[in-house]
From Swiss-Prot:
It comes from Homo sapiens. Residues 541-552, 588-601, 724-740, 838-865, 947-956, 1151-1160, 1195-1215, 1597-1607 have a biased composition (Polar residues). Residues 58-127, 206-273 form the BTB domain. Involved in clathrin-mediated endocytosis at the synapse. Plays a role in neuronal development and in synaptic vesicle recycling in mature neurons, a process required for normal synaptic transmission. This is BTB/POZ domain-containing protein 8. It comes from the Eukaryota. InterPro entries: BACK_BTBD8 (IPR043225), BTB/POZ_dom (IPR000210), BTBD8_BTB_POZ_1 (IPR040121), BTBD8_C (IPR027907), SKP1/BTB/POZ_sf (IPR011333).
Length: 1792
């Protein structure tokens, strides 16, 4: 047994080398061999016994008595040669095989046993043979002679004696030393084997020959058949081999056959040395020799694997070979053993070069086994081993697989450790890991584990992780090893998470296991420190519940609540705060928790929803009547309503909100409580934010509470708390918080920004300065802490209010003075322009829009940088005229902001975390405060430049952060300011104050119109009276409001020229201040307030107070404005404000209560737009704001609001509204044009929503964003113009095509373009025919519809997307920017974008328009569908869907109704929802394809809107050119213009209608307006508008709204309707604003066009080349040369746009600061660049702080107004932004 001996020797050597294992191997080897021997011998016996029984291939027969026995000569010869000789030998010659051989003297049974022993016995059977022979011989009496003769024969024939003689020798040496020649070197399994083997070795009577490789092997058929199933089959049956004398075998070598034959005969346990064991194993498998397989496996285990004892270097490779052999043959047992061994020693095996040669599937199997083997005990060990392996492996090709596997294993180990951290830290291996890390130079593994834990903190595991970390910290080993600091740092972060996510965490199982001490600490800390920091990764659950604390009105009550029920408050706060932090950490839990806590509230909500209208009316009445307490209660009710989805929040909020409301009432009564009111406003805003905001509202309240509690001063604390929590909430729940902040901020920001516009007179100067400062203060206060805020707020509110009053009075006193005094340099020209175009209200409106865009551009630029920035820019613009006021405000506010800033720094830190750069925000805020001051001073200088420079440096970077924070701060501040003002004003005029607040809100709106509306004052008084009546009878009041408003509007419209001039100036101011801020402000405030009131209980209080708040700053400022204007047209303002507020309240209530009120409101809005461009603008803005508020009310809305702001800044929507963003950023306010209104105002509002909406819409937004760029670019194109319906900002086919062609169009882009074209055509046809039954309606109607679609899209988008329209349109940019700046926003945005992308992805299916591949290019319908789906999919937002739907329905009222139907079909507005720009674009296809018709339409509109010449004039020529050329611009301009036309026309028609239908025909008016809107919307939006018609009835709208919105993301459907109307209004308003801020509008339009151009390029080029940079550059190029960017058409339109821009700029020279200091072209370019930068910034929204800094740089770069600088800046910002801005767009495009 050479092999055996060698094998046994080798193991000995191995053992020797192994050392300790030598004994083990010695034991294991023999044991294995004995087992194998027994197995093989038994098998051999069984085989032969079966052969005997089956009588197979027998050749001899024995006859014993009567019984015959068949046997085999070969076996008998081998086993009993003597017997064979005696029985067969003598007769062998004479007998044939057939003849039986008689065996006598032996019984049959005995002979049978004898044969069985012969065949099966493993022992020597000599004794049996002798016994039988003895009997046989005796009986037969055979002669000795015969015996002698026969014996020799026997010997000769069988060689039995020789064989037996040899075999015993073999056996004696058999153990391991048996080494014999040739065939006997293998050990047989038994005696039987030995005997049979002799037959083979020395062939005896063989009966078959086997030929292999030309060699012959003699064998026996019987034994072959018995031993091998293969041979049994071959040698039996009808095969040829069965009858042949020989067989030839293929695929086997003679060596292998020899081994096989030895086994068949002897059951040998070894194989020759040089034989391939793998081949033997394979052969055994093929020939069915199971025993031989066992032998081969034994050889493999012995020689290759050393029986898997301690690994020896020599065995590593052989084990791998064995593994491969086992795998190839399929030997599972051996393969499993090898795998286990390799897994056990993976570090050594993977480093073997031979491991690289293993098949990849085996390598993967090793890895999988390792991963599956992970447990608590070995995880740390495997982590260390994998790390060791990675370090030790050389970086060469053959180690790549091992390195990859080791890295994957390390990741799995870390993930497992994170998941089972509490158990693993108790294992020995983890202690070893800590020791090894302590001894190593760098504790990389521990750092990695801790980082992974930090990144994977969730509400579910946070408590257990905290306990585990505590255990680690308390262990001696940790202290000794010096890891305490690292672990403590992680614990601190975890603690922050728990504090922020307390609301959700407290419901987890592990929470119950925590120590009560920790639980109490977390619960206590949760209120104040919820947003101190943001974790690196947003927790799974993000909720915006924190927004609840936004309720300012709840502040006072919250204070009392806090004071009286501090513990209870803490609980609520803790709950709410948790929810808020949930925004960061556990929105799901928070949401459920809130709902749980809100269960009772839900009931309230349900009741409220039922009584929502009543409540709303009550609230309105109370607001007007000064029923502050009632207002507070209704707010609570409304809030409950708002918190419909978040009962917990409501619950948390309810008492508090009741208190807040009481406080709000008190705040209304007392100036100090204004702070609370401000908070209430915030809270209401938060609540308005929608389901999430609802939760947020609770959270905000809670935060406010918590902060106040923390603070010692409940009152001061609450407001700031709200702001802080809002920020934190924003931070915590990027989306929710952002929503809240955006809602709050956008609302407040909207109110701030929009207040600015609305208070362009008051707010721009006051608002910008004051608001900026108030906002800054508020922001700072809110950011700093709730602490300063109340004081700051009061101070700000008071001083602001005073200054606002003074300045407002001044503003009101002289429109020009107001314009200049208000820093309305643009508005002044606007006013002049408006005066010039007095006959043309539309022109004035357009001019005002233009000027507004300038302001908006600057303001939005600032705002893009930060709410303060925007305000700053607005302020700076107005600063020229408002410097004194701004300075005053700045001084007061700046001081407050600084104080607040200090406090805010604390709050801001949490908020910074929440806001990405809360600190920077604080700094920014302080900077902004300073900047505001600087800007106030600088604003005297060209605000654009100053803003560009100052804002870029201090505020732009801040803008993202600050804009979010500041926005929320601004909102808070504004709310506070508003509330301060309002509160103060409230005390001044409790009832009138409410009315006044409402009036202020309206007055703000009115205040834009006050001068012109002084005549309106009577009407406004009527309105007020009507409004009071309306408050008494909400529905009636709605109608009355509408009637009175219509009357007022009619009157106002009659007076509109003058009104328009002053109003436009005011509105322009307001518009400039915040895009459509006059609307937004007034309506924003009134709507916000009213919506707050109606939408949120807190908001209800807000309405009293928040209206005061919103209207405070706005109303306060607006009040101041109103005071000014009220002084001028105080009653008018009050009445209008009141009416407006009531209207808003009605709207809010309806929003809250019903789509009906909303519809009414919207009708009002729609009708209000009829009031005048300003009023329409205001109404549009109001609508937009209302929608924003609606959005705020809606969870989506909250998202929207947040998105509106954030989305403007951060949201891809901003990108979508590339133009908008810039407009938003720079012209955030200025973008009062359709885009701006939508974006700046609505989108601001919606922006928050856009955040969730952004989340929902984000991807769409992104696409829209990019599309916006595209749309912008495309819109400039001729195709764009005609089809460049991509006005919407979504790139239309033409836009895309144009872009695609001129830039570079990928097939995908072309495809998209084609789809867009098809879609456009389709849209035209579908939209016109299908969607727009009114399509055949006058082209005029179509443009109107388009604008309506725009507004609707914007609003609907806000609504439906809950923030898509606004967020998508312009606020998307700002939201983007904000989101960009805020991590929260980023997270929200990403979430939103993800949702949106999902929507967009899912929406593509619903795409109504063929061929639209790119969402960005999927214009309205597809985007709408997508957005719709997105919105639908975005259930967070949908949480509020019922209430929001109702609200939305009511808010979006008539518009929503069409959208309900259209939502099903994903009408343009739906798409618009998804991508407001796209929607617009699509709609714009219809619209813009009608844009060509737009000329006609415009003409018609001009005819229809002869009064609205603003649009007609500008729109006809400029606007048509702008529209076409600026189809992108058209989005803004034409949208604005068209919307203006629509709005104006609608207004005019409505006005006419209203004039005709005053009062009694309000419904008809509304319906008419709805019809107009419907027609417009339908024309614009296709089916949606048809739906609009259907939805027209206010009553229907609420139902449809609520149902549809519930169905189709209620908001989406309803939003579509409402938004369409609102959009219409908004668009009108935007158009008005755009028109009124003509320069800005054009600039905006151009900027938008540029942006659109950029977007198309971005969308088209970006796909292949265009990033944000490209987009930016393209924008810049577009700005510098739209012609280059656009196609020839684009160029043509670009020229037109430029011409328009230049005209606008020239008109707006004084207004356009940029124009002032720079040549027109440069100014335009700069303006566009600024917008582009803002958009780019928006594009880079995800980058958050970085973007802010980048934006600062950009701003600084742009500040020179140097084209190259701007371009460079654009490129720079593009790069920063491109990854997420353009990339996302590309991603979305790619998805399609």
């Amino acid at each position: 047994m050479a092999r055996c001996g060698e094998g046994s020797a080798a193991p000995m050597v191995l053992l020797g080398s192994a050392g300790v294992c030598s004994k083990g191997l010695q034991r294991k080897g023999p044991c294995e061999r004995r087992r194998l021997k027994a197995t093989v011998s038994e098998q051999l016996s069984q085989d032969l016994l079966r052969l005997l029984r089956e009588e197979f291939h027998t050749d001899v027969t024995f006859s014993v008595g009567c019984t015959l026995f068949k046997a085999h000569k070969a076996v008998l010869l081998a086993r009993v040669p003597d017997f064979y000789f005696h029985t067969i030998g003598q007769t062998s010659n004479s007998l044939t095989n057939q003849e039986p051989i008689a065996v006598e003297n032996v019984e049959a049974l005995e002979f049978r046993t004898f044969l069985q022993i012969i065949y099966s016995s493993n022992r020597n059977i000599k004794n049996y043979e002798e016994e039988i022979l003895r009997k046989k011989i005796m009986e037969i009496g055979i002669s000795q002679k015969q015996l002698d003769i026969s014996f020799p024969k026997c010997e000769n024939s069988s060689d039995c004696s020789l064989q037996k003689h040899e075999i015993p020798e073999d056996i004696s040496d058999r153990d391991d030393d048996f080494i014999s020649n040739d065939n006997y070197d293998l050990e047989p399994a038994s005696e039987l084997g030995e005997d049979l083997l002799k037959l083979y070795v020395k062939p005896c009577c063989p009966d078959i020959d086997i030929f292999v490789d030309g060699k012959r092997f003699k064998a026996h058929r019987a034994i072959l058949s018995a031993r091998s199933s293969y041979f049994a089959a071959m040698l039996s049956g009808c095969w040829a081999e069965s009858s042949q004398e020989y067989v030839t075998l293929q695929g086997i070598s003679h060596v292998e056959l020899n081994v096989m034959m030895h086994f068949i005969y002897g059951g040998t346990l070894d194989i020759p040395d040089k034989t391939n064991v793998g081949q033997i194993l394979n052969m055994a498998d093929m020939y069915g020799l199971e025993g031989l397989k066992e032998v081969a496996i034994y050889i493999l285990r012995r020689d290759y694997c050393n029986f898997f004892q301690k690994p020896v270097p020599r065995t590593l490779t052989s084990i791998l070979e064995c593994l491969i052999i086992a795998h190839s043959v399929g030997v599972e047992s051996l393969f499993a053993d090898c795998m286990k061994w390799i897994v056990k020693h993976f570090a050594r095996f993977w480093s073997e070069r031979s491991f690289a040669n293993i098949p990849p599937e085996i390598q993967k199997s090793c890895l999988n086994m390792l991963i599956q083997s992970l447990n608590d005990k070995n995880a740390a060990f495997l982590l260390m081993e994998s790390d060791r392996l990675i370090i030790s492996l050389p970086r060469v090709k053959w180690t790549e697989a091992a390195l990859t596997m080791a890295s994957q294993l390390q990741e799995k180990c870390i993930a497992f450790i994170v998941d089972n951290f509490s158990k693993i830290i108790q294992s020995e291996n983890f202690a070893l890991l800590l020791q090894s890390q302590a001894m190593s130079s760098t504790a990389d593994l521990l750092d990695t584990i801790l980082k992974a834990i930090e990144e994977n903190i969730t509400t579910e595991n946070s408590c257990s992780l905290l306990m585990a970390l505590d255990t680690l910290l308390n262990s001696d080993s940790t202290k000794e090893m010096g890891f305490t600091c690292k672990i403590q740092a992680l614990r601190d972060k975890l603690w922050i998470f728990l504090v922020q996510s307390f609301y959700a965490v407290r419901h987890t199982e592990s929470w119950k296991l925590m120590s009560t001490d920790d639980q109490q600490k977390i619960q206590a800390a949760a209120f104040d420190k919820g947003d101190d920091r943001r974790l690196g990764k947003k927790p799974i659950f993000s909720s915006s519940q924190q927004r609840k604390q936004v309720s300012d009105s709840g502040d006072i009550k919250i204070k009392s609540w806090r004071g009286n029920n501090k513990k209870e408050c803490w609980s609520y706060l803790s709950t709410n705060k948790k929810m808020k932090s949930d925004g960061l950490g556990a929105s799901g839990h928070s949401s459920s928790t809130n709902r749980n806590s809100i269960n009772k509230t839900l009931k309230q909500d349900d009741v409220k929803e039922k009584d929502g209208t009543k409540i709303a009316s009550k609230i309105t009445k109370e607001l007007k009547t000064g029923g502050k307490n009632v207002s507070g209660k209704p707010k609570t009710v409304t809030k409950s309503k708002t918190e419909n989805g978040d009962k917990a929040r409501l619950e948390n909020m309810s008492p508090r909100q009741v208190v807040e409301r009481s406080a709000t009432a008190a705040a209304a009564a007392t100036g100090q409580k204004n702070l609370l009111n401000g908070k209430g406003v915030r809270n209401q805003e938060g609540q308005i934010s929608g389901a999430r905001p609802k939760v947020l509202t609770g959270n905000l309240n809670v935060q406010a509470k918590a902060k106040p509690l923390k603070k010692a001063t409940g009152k001061d604390s609450p407001c700031l708390s709200i702001a802080g929590p809002s920020s934190r909430s924003t931070d915590s729940s990027m989306e929710f918080s952002i929503s809240t902040e955006c809602l709050d901020e956008p609302k407040e920001n909207g109110s701030t920004e929009e207040e600015k516009p609305s208070g362009h007179k008051l707010s721009f100067c006051d608002s910008p300065g004051q608001m900026m400062k108030n906002s800054v203060d508020s922001v700072k206060n809110s950011t700093v802490a709730i602490k300063s805020r109340p004081v700051s707020r009061v101070t700000n509110g008071t001083s602001n209010k005073k200054s606002i009053h003074e300045q407002d009075t001044n503003v009101n006193n002289s429109v020009l003075k107001k314009v200049s005094g208000k820093g309305c340099s643009e508005p002044v020209p606007q006013a002049i322009l408006k005066k010039r175009g007095t006959s043309n209200g539309c022109t004035a409106a357009q001019q005002r829009t233009k000027s507004t865009p300038s302001n908006l551009t600057k303001t939005q630029g600032s705002q893009g940088e930060s709410p303060n920035s925007v305000k700053s820019s607005v302020s700076s613009r107005q600063s020229d005229e408002n410097v004194a006021k701004l300075d005053h405000n700045t001084t007061t506010e700046k001081q407050a902001p600084k104080r607040k800033m200090v406090k805010q720094v604390h709050t801001a830190l949490p908020k910074v975390n929440a806001k990405i750069v809360a600190m920077p925000k604080n700094l920014n805020q302080s900077k902004k405060g300073e900047t505001l001051n600087n800007k106030d001073s600088k604003q005297k200088m060209p605000p654009g430049q100053v803003i560009s420079k100052t804002q870029p440096s201090s505020q732009r970077p801040l803008k993202h952060e600050t804009s979010t924070v500041q926005k929320s701060m601004f909102h808070d501040v504004r709310d506070n300011n508003n509330k301060d003002s309002v509160s103060e004003q409230k005390p001044h005029k409790p009832l009138i104050n409410l009315a006044s607040e409402i009036s202020d809100a309206e007055a703000l709106q009115s205040s834009c119109r006050p001068d012109p509306q002084k005549p309106l004052n009577d009407q406004e008084k009527e309105k007020l009276a009507l409004e009071c009546q309306n408050i008494s009878k909400l529905d009636k009041s709605l109608k009355h409001e509408l009637e009175s408003k219509q009357i007022c509007l009619d009157k106002s419209e009659t007076k509109f020229p003058n009104h328009k001039e002053t109003d436009d100036c005011d509105a322009a101011n307001i518009c400039c201040h915040s895009v459509g801020s006059d609307n937004v402000n007034s309506k924003f405030y009134s709507t916000t307030a009213l919506k707050y009131m109606v939408s949120n209980p807190n908001e209800n209080s807000l309405n009293s107070n928040p209206v005061c708040d919103l209207d405070s700053t706005s109303a306060g400022q607006i009040h101041l404005i109103s005071d000014r204007e009220n002084q001028v047209g105080r009653k008018d303002t009050n009445k209008q404000s009141s009416i407006k507020c009531v209207e808003d309240v009605s709207l809010c209530n309806p929003e809250r209560t019903n789509g009906t009120l909303n519809s009414a409101q919207e009708d009002k809005k729609s009708k209000v737009p009829v009031e005048g461009l300003t009023i329409p603008s205001k109404l549009s803005d109001e609508s937009a704001m209302d929608e924003d508020k609606h959005a705020t009310a809606d969870s989506d809305v909250s998202s929207k609001c947040f998105s509106g702001q954030l989305s403007e800044k951060n949201s891809p929507k901003n990108m979508e509204t590339s133009e908008s963003p810039e407009s938003h950023e720079t012209p955030e306010t200025p973008f009062v044009g359709h885009w701006n209104l939508s974006t700046g105002v609505l989108h601001q509002r919606e922006s928050p929503e856009s955040d969730t909406g952004s989340a929902t819409t984000s991807s769409d937004d992104i696409k829209p964003r990019s599309e916006d760029y595209d749309a912008g670019g495309s819109q400039d194109d001729d195709g764009s113009n005609d089809r460049g319906i991509s006005k919407c900002g979504t790139m239309l086919c033409h836009d895309f095509l144009g872009r695609s062609s001129s830039d570079t169009s990928t097939p995908e882009e072309l495809k998209i373009y084609d789809s867009n074209l098809r879609i456009e055509v389709k849209m035209k046809k579908q939209s016109n025919n299908d969607l727009f039954q009114v399509n055949s309606t006058s082209d005029d109607e179509i443009p109107r519809k388009r604008p309506e679609i725009w507004s609707r899209s914007a609003i609907v988008h806000s609504r439906e997307r809950e923030n898509i329209p606004r967020g998508s349109v312009q606020f998307a940019q700002e939201i983007d920017q904000v989101s960009s700046s805020a991590d929260e926003t980023e997270d929200e945005r990403s979430e939103a974008e993800n949702v949106a992308e999902n929507f967009s992805i899912s929406n593509p299916a619903p795409q109504q328009f063929q061929g639209i591949i790119n969402l960005a290019f999927e214009d309205a319908t597809e985007n709408e569908c997508r957005e719709f789906s997105a919105t639908k999919k975005f259930k967070r937002s949908v949480l509020l869907s019922v209430d929001e739907c109702e609200e939305l329905g009511s808010d979006e009222g008539e518009v929503h109704t069409p959208f309900q139907a259209s939502v099903d079909s994903f009408s343009p507005s739906d798409v618009f929802d998804g991508i407001s720009h796209e929607h617009h674009g699509r709609t714009c296809y219809s619209r813009f394809s009608r844009e060509s018709e737009d000329n006609i339409l415009e003409c018609k509109q001009n005819k229809g809107n002869s009064v609205c010449k603003n649009e007609s004039t500008v729109l006809d020529l400029s606007s048509i050119d702008s529209s076409r050329k600026n189809k992108q611009s058209v989005s803004a301009t034409e949208k604005k213009n068209t919307i203006d036309v629509l709005s104006s026309r609608s207004r005019q028609l409505l006005r006419e209608d209203k004039k005709v239908n005053n009062g009694s025909n309000v419904e008809n008016d509304i319906q008419q307006r709805s019809k107009f809107l419907d027609s417009d919307v339908k024309s614009q939006e296709r089916p949606c508008h048809l739906d609009l018609h259907q939805r027209e009835p206010n009553s229907d709208i609420p139902k449809n709204s609520s149902t549809k919105s519930l169905d189709s993301f209620r908001s989406q459907v309803l939003p579509q309707e409402g938004p369409v109307k609102e959009s219409h209004s908004t668009t009108t308003e935007k158009a008005n604003i755009a028109l009124s801020a003509g320069d800005i509008d054009d600039c905006d339009t151009l900027a938008q066009t540029r942006m659109y151009d950029h977007r198309p390029s971005k969308t088209l080029s970006p796909i292949y080349e265009m990033d944000v940079i490209e987009a930016f550059e393209q924008k810049v190029e577009s700005e510098t040369h739209v012609t280059d960017m656009d196609f020839e058409d684009d160029q043509h339109f670009a020229k037109q746009d430029w011409t328009l821009l230049k005209q606008l700029l020239s008109e707006q020279d004084s207004n356009l600061d940029v124009t002032n200091s720079v040549p027109e072209d440069l100014s335009l370019a700069q303006y566009l660049i600024n917008q582009t930068l803002l958009l780019a910034r928006d594009s880079s929204k995800p980058q958050g702080i970085t973007h802010i800094d980048t934006l600062n740089r950009w701003s600084e770069l742009t500040s020179p107004l140097d084209s190259s600088a701007s371009i460079t800046m654009a490129s720079f910002s593009s790069e920063d932004c491109s990854p997420q801005g353009e990339w996302t767009i590309l991603e979305l495009e790619t998805q399609h």
